[in-house]
Amino acid sequence: MSEAKIGLIDIETSPLRAHTWGLFDQNVGLNQIDREWTILSFCFKPLGASKKLTEYMDTAGDPLNDKAIVQRLWEIMHDYDFLIAQNGKRFDMRKMRARMILHDLPPPSPVRVIDTMLMARQVAAFTSNKLEWLSTYLSKIQKSKHKAFPGFELWSECLNDNPKAWAAMKKYNIPDVLSMEQVYLKLRPWVTGHPN
């Protein structure tokens, strides 16, 4: 029996663009949306592999065209038995599947999701289960901050195809996966029934 293929993944998505009449408690109708969300970038790394094998891909040059990214994500999902992701069950996997369906791709081979946020919640009562907190205390690599493009500005400038914003996105996306790997390895022995 061959060893299970396990990888770590993190995606960054663009926001929907919609028209509203206010800032708080808005109900946005479907006819108010004028731009669908897409996947802007992803980072992937096989568990335990050298940092040199970390893969990063983005939509620089054509920010709203995620077809190539979605195809590559499909290949990764099809090829791996387990994918580790922070908030992966609620966000990353569902978003990736949505884009795969919209791009008319067939379902990839079944992949099991290991969600580091749910692992943290299951084994302990940390102050926060966000990657920013977990990586500060459980990893030598911290979740990156994008100071040159604070808050939403990073996503906005990537959508404007600003090369400096894309460079910042890469510096933001890759450490998420590297720190998540260390968080996962720290939590794994604490999860009952989880293979070590």
Model-derived regions, located:
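Acidic active-site catalytic centers that drive phospho-/nucleotidyl reactions
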Residues: D10-E12, D92, D115, D176
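Conserved RNase H-like, two-metal-ion catalytic cores of nucleic-acid enzymes
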Residues: M1-H78
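Conserved DEDDh/DEDDy metal-dependent 3′-5′ exonuclease domain
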Residues: S50-L138
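Short, surface-exposed recognition loops or helix-turn segments adjacent to catalytic cores
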Residues: V28-L30, P108-M117, K145-W155
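Conserved aromatic-histidine-acidic binding/catalytic patches
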Residues: L30, D34, G61, I84-G88, ...
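Short, function-defining helix-loop hinge/capping sites that tune catalysis or transport
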Residues: A18-T20, K95, V123, Y184
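Acidic, Mg2+-coordinating catalytic module of metal-dependent nucleases/exonucleases
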Residues: I84, W133-N196
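Hydrophobic alpha-helical membrane context
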Residues: G22, R99, T127, L187-R188
